[in-house]
Amino acid sequence: VSIDCSGYPKPACTLEFFPLCGSDNQTYSNKCAFCNAAVEKNVTLNHIGEC
């Protein structure tokens, strides 16, 4: 499973809830929050859903 993070980071994210579990074992609330972290901290996707 991969998430396309082209166009990130963004300055603000919506409050949409679509949890994604990152390789840092942190649950990100949605694609925007995950992609911001992926770009800034080189986090990858472990799986869709909470960690």
From Swiss-Prot:
Listed A to Z, the keywords are: Disulfide bond, Glycoprotein, Protease inhibitor, Repeat, Secreted, Serine protease inhibitor
Domain (Kazal-like) ranges = 3-51
CDD domains from the xrefs?
A: KAZAL_FS
The primary site where this protein sits is secreted
Q: Which InterPro entries match?
A: Bifunctional_prot_inhibitor, Kazal_dom, Kazal_dom_sf, Prot_inh_Kazal-m
Localization of this protein: Secreted
Show the SMART domains listed in the entry: KAZAL (SM00280)
Give the positions of the site Reactive bond 3.
Answer: L15, E16
Q: Which GO terms describe its molecular function?
A: serine-type endopeptidase inhibitor activity
PROSITE patterns membership: KAZAL_1, KAZAL_2
Leader sequence range is none
UniProt keyword annotation of Disulfide bond present: yes
Among the Pfam families in the record, one is Kazal_1
Asked if Repeat is a keyword of the record, the answer is yes
Per the record, the domain of life is Eukaryota
Q: Glycosylated where?
A: N42
S-S bridge residues: C5-C35, C13-C32, C21-C51
Q: Name one GO cellular component term.
A: extracellular region
The record's comment about this protein's domains reads: Avian ovomucoid consists of three homologous, tandem Kazal family inhibitory domains.
- Report what the protein is called: Ovomucoid
